[in-house]
From Swiss-Prot:
Xref: SMART domains: RAB, RAN, RAS, RHO
DNA-binding in keyword set: no
Disulphide-bridged cysteine pairs: none
Stated name of the protein: Ras-related protein YPTC6
Species of origin: Chlamydomonas reinhardtii (Chlamydomonas smithii)
Keyword Chloroplast: no
A GO MF term: GTP binding
Ligand binding (GTP): 19-26, 67-71, 125-128
Motif (Effector region): 41-49
GO terms under cellular component: plasma membrane
Top-level taxonomic group: Eukaryota
Length: 216
């Protein structure tokens, strides 16, 4: 069985991880891209990203997952971090209610700096620590319904729902972007119109296809 080389893909999607420090963003990244988990995760200086390709509807989707790498401690995340992002995983720790309370602030920052049509998923991480749960699932679900977000609970430690979370958000992005491409081909004068349009890159607005350039 032949595998496509890493640079052979149909779409490149930038997805950002945001949320309070210590909620498990780096481990979600490493679990999805390398199937690794570290109990001694240390904040990285600068911005870290990793990539992984998946198949959606017969297309190769290369996900470029960005991690804040500790910047959130200083509230120093810049607009450059969000630029070009078509998806965001907003992560909190189910055992620490303060990390859930801060979700609203993160959501506001995301909506202030990112494209208005970015796909957002709320992720309640550390579901393996059910005995220490401080945020009820129903409360988080109600928040997501109110804000129009998708929702999932994960455990990077046990690898529970990590794959599902990334597959779900990347599939949703793909369906929106591919619909945009079809719409623009069917009705060229209306390019850029419609509620579900995601602008991948203002200079190369081509639905995120590789030949239009990287979308970061």
């Amino acid at each position: 069985m032949s595998h496509k080389p890493d640079d052979d893909y149909d779409y490149l999607f930038k997805v950002v991880l945001i949320g309070d420090s210590g909620v498990g963003k780096s481990n979600l990244l490493s679990r999805f891209t390398r199937n690794e988990f570290s109990l001694e995760s240390k904040s990285t200086i600068g911005v870290e990203f990793a990539t992984r390709s998946i198949q959606v509807d017969g297309k190769t989707i290369k996900a470029q997952i960005w991690d804040t790498a500790g910047q959130e401690r200083y509230r120093a995340i810049t607009s450059a971090y969000y630029r070009g992002a078509v998806g965001a995983l907003l992560v909190y720790d189910i055992t620490k209610s303060v990390t859930f309370e801060n979700v609203e602030r993160w959501l506001k920052e995301l909506r202030d700096h990112a494209d208005s049509n970015i796909v957002i998923m709320l992720v309640g991480n550390k579901s393996d620590l059910k005995h220490l749960r401080d945020v009820q699932t129903e409360v988080a679900q109600a928040f997501c319904e109110r804000e129009g977000l998708s929702f999932i609970e994960t455990s990077a430690l046990e690898s529970t729902n990590v794959e599902k979370a990334f597959q779900q958000i990347l599939t949703e992005i793909y369906h929106i972007v591919s619909k945009k491409v079809l719409d623009s081909e069917d009705n060229r004068p209306k390019i850029g119109e419609g509620r579900d349009v995601i602008v991948i890159d203002n200079a190369h607005d081509d639905g995120g296809k590789k030949k239009g350039g990287c979308c970061s």
